[in-house]
Design a protein with these regions (language model features):
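Helicase-associated low-complexity regulatory tails and linkers flanking the ATPase motor
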Residues: 1-4, 11-32, 37-159, 177, ...
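Structural motif
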Residues: 4-6, 109, 164, 182
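Catalytic acidic motif of RecA-like/P-loop NTPases
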Residues: 8-12, 169-170
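SF2 helicase motor core recognition
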Residues: 164-179, 196-200
């Protein structure tokens, strides 16, 4: 009897303890899978081209950032502005799924900075004005010490319209209906950026629908560094520049 070992999310399972368990199987074949692999000079690197994964229908065709943003944003509340854009997109996508008879409820992922209780309150307040809340199971919270309405969130027809997170969902989270990211968190390292974007790139039914709205994923953010990084990853044509009114340029999360 011989074993072949497959380790998913290997970038976070590359530890002495994990290696000790692997060695118990006395295998000569170990496959480590990750979007952000840790370099192992002894391993053979097999890279799967993004185009091949798209062609198989496993991930979305394009990442769209700040779609149709005006050159100057006129708003008193940047957070609510981003959330409104995201919710409008969610409703637009959901209506097409309904018209096609497809039971998918696209999920908005709202990523907060650390130490942002006031910002979390503001996010919940906005969603409450739209009838999205904990009580009716349409809002989920996945924060340290606070997990609400997480059950069945990965189901394509889950009731949750939005989930509020910080870091926990970025790695190893499997929710293919996640399609829209509102990124309020800044200053993440490149590995974390890749993992975060990856959360909204899966196709809910592992196939494309020949409809741009359904086959694309969407990000709404005012994080300039992240916008530049995402431009590099998805193509500059997917981005429109955003200019903030002078009185809001000192705003910090």
């Amino acid at each position: 009897l011989s074993f072949k070992i497959i380790i998913d999310e290997s970038h976070q399972n590359f530890t002495d303890k994990a290696d000790a368990i692997v060695q118990l199987f006395k295998t000569n074949k170990i496959i480590r899978c990750s979007a952000t692999p840790i370099v192992d000079k002894k391993a053979k690197l097999i890279e799967i081209a993004e185009e091949d994964v798209i062609a198989e229908g496993l991930i979305k065709k394009l990442l769209v950032i700040n779609e149709n943003f005006p050159q100057t944003i006129e708003t008193d509340n940047q957070t609510w502005y981003l959330l409104e854009r995201a919710l409008n997109k969610q409703r637009e996508i959901k209506s097409i799924f309904l018209n096609k008879g497809i039971a998918v409820n696209p999920l908005i992922v709202v990523q907060l900075p650390n130490n942002s209780d006031a910002l979390c309150d503001s996010v919940e307040e906005y969603f409450a004005t739209q009838g999205i809340n904990i009580e009716n199971d349409t809002l989920a919270i996945w924060l340290s010490g606070r997990h609400e309405n997480i059950e069945n969130i990965s189901d394509n027809d889950g009731k949750q319209i939005a989930v509020v997170i910080k870091q926990a969902v970025a790695t190893g989270w499997d929710c293919p209906r996640a399609q829209i990211l509102v990124k309020l968190r800044e200053n993440m390292d490149e590995t974390f950026e890749i993992q975060t974007i990856g959360r909204i790139r899966r196709m809910p039914e592992a196939n494309h629908y020949d409809n741009q709205l359904l086959d694309y994923c969407y990000i709404y953010t005012l994080d300039k560094a992240f916008i530049e990084y995402a431009k590099k990853e998805s193509g500059a044509h997917a981005v429109k520049k955003v200019f903030i009114k002078p009185q809001y340029k000192t705003f910090r999360l």
